[in-house]
Structure formats: structure tokens, C-alpha cells
Regions:
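Hot-dog-fold acyl-thioester-processing enzymes
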Residues: 1-55, 102-104, 111-186
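Acidic/His-leaning functional-site neighborhoods
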Residues: 150-232
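HotDog/MaoC-like acyl-thioester-processing domains
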Residues: 2-4, 57-62, 67-143, 199-201, ...
Length: 235
């Protein structure tokens, strides 16, 4: 399992002085990027093969939010592949050595020329090795959005600071956007994120919030009501 050590920075905190949900997502993303770079299959190499990995789904279970200044270890390990999909585990350990965060993710390998999924080959996955999936609840990568009962929020336009090197809204930014529509007293213990399409600079995002029996669902939609991203929050 690949890992790197870090320390929770002030710039990564939520208002409660703990590592924010989008800060957690950013650490997980950074961890898989660092592993790929160290194995010699980083972004430039994969792009040179006219391929790219895109994130489809997160399942993130939060036992404890790390504190300001806490030394943490972020770890990741591939846990399988099938057709055009790759599967990956993540863990964030606190100073006590216990797992504060556990996560499972699903990725799709794309052909960068055709911008269509392509089959995962040995050169795409073998370097990582394969571990067993974490013992998390097995859930669908598709998040169902209710047909009614949603509360529309004020629409906004995608800005440059929302974007990453792929020129679309970064995965962590969607989580940050969606979290803004939760009640201040709500504590996220699990979040699931389904990425459906790419929002670009200048696109309009229309958030719709739904109250659920165990939390909330936020659909970040385009002007026609099609979701870019759906985030399910459970307390």
C-alpha cells in the first residue's frame, strides 16, 4: 500500500477547526496522484498513451475528522479492475494510528482522443498491485435522485478557481459546493459522490437539495436539469 505523511493545515479546515470534507477528498486525490507519479505512470505518461483516468464514484466513511495541526498518514491501494473500470481503496490515519477515514472509489479509463471509455490493459494496472477491497457496505455507484421534494438553491457560474488541469470542475470542488447547502449542525459521517458529466468554465450550476431519512442529497445540475454531480450525505 502506498502512503505519504502530512499535517492538517489551517487552510484545509472547516469552520469547526477540523479537516473539511473537501479537504479529505483532496488528500485522497493527491495520494493516488503521488503513487502514480512515483511508479512512473503519472499524468504525463498516461496522457502520452492518449488515455486518462476519470473518477466516477466515491464512498467515504468518516469515523473522525482530523484536527488542525494533526500529523496524518494518507494511504491508497488498487483493489481490482474490470473492463474499463479501476477500483481503489483509501485510508487516512490519525496520530493515534487508527483509521479516521476509509474510502472506496471507482474510476473509468478514457481514450483521450475519442473521449470514450477504453478497456483496462495490464500496462494500466499491473504496476499498482491488487489488494482486497475495504470491508465497507457494498453500495451502487449510481445514486438515485428523488423525483420530487427538492429545494432549488441559487444558481451560480463556474469560475476559473473551480477548475483543474483537465479544464473542468475538480472532483473536490463539487464536494465543497454541495456541502454549502447542508445545515450548520449536520455532521457528515458518510458521503457518496457520483460524477456524471463535466462542468466547464462559464457553465451554470443549479443546486437542488433533498432531505433524506438519514441525511441529505444535493444534485448539482445544469440549466436543463441534468446532473453534473450527485452527492449523498449521511449523518
Amino acid at each position: 500500500m502506498y502512503s505519504f505523511d502530512s499535517r492538517v493545515r489551517y487552510s484545509e479546515l472547516a469552520e469547526n477547526g477540523k479537516l473539511s470534507p473537501d479537504g479529505i477528498v483532496n488528500y485522497l486525490q493527491d495520494c493516488t496522484c503521488f503513487e502514480s507519479e512515483e511508479l512512473g505512470v503519472g499524468m504525463d505518461t498516461v496522457y502520452g498513451r492518449q488515455k486518462m483516468w476519470v473518477l466516477n464514484f466515491w464512498q467515504i466513511v468518516i469515523d473522525r475528522y482530523p484536527d488542525m495541526g494533526e500529523h496524518i498518514k494518507i494511504a491508497t491501494q488498487a483493489c481490482g479492475s474490470e473492463k474499463m473500470f479501476g477500483y481503489r481503496n483509501f485510508l487516512i490515519y490519525g496520530e493515534d494510528g487508527k483509521a479516521a477515514v476509509q474510502a472506496y472509489s471507482i474510476w473509468t479509463l478514457l481514450d483521450r482522443v475519442k473521449m470514450r471509455p477504453c478497456m483496462v490493459s495490464p500496462e494500466d494496472i499491473d504496476l499498482y498491485g491488487i489488494a482486497d477491497p475495504l470491508p465497507l457496505e457494498k453500495v451502487s455507484r449510481k445514486i438515485s435522485v428523488p423525483n420530487e421534494g427538492g429545494q432549488e438553491q441559487k444558481a451560480f457560474v463556474v469560475q476559473e478557481y473551480h477548475l483543474d488541469t483537465n479544464h473542468h470542475v475538480n472532483n473536490g470542488q463539487y464536494v465543497r459546493m454541495a456541502t454549502a447547502y447542508l445545515p450548520e449542525t449536520f455532521v457528515i459521517r458518510e458521503l457518496r459522490v457520483e460524477y456524471r458529466s463535466q462542468a466547464m468554465l462559464g457553465d451554470t450550476i443549479r443546486p437542488v437539495r433533498y432531505e433524506m431519512p438519514d441525511g441529505y442529497l444535493v444534485a448539482l445540475q445544469d440549466s436543463a436539469g441534468k446532473a453534473y454531480c450527485v452527492v449523498r450525505f449521511m449523518g
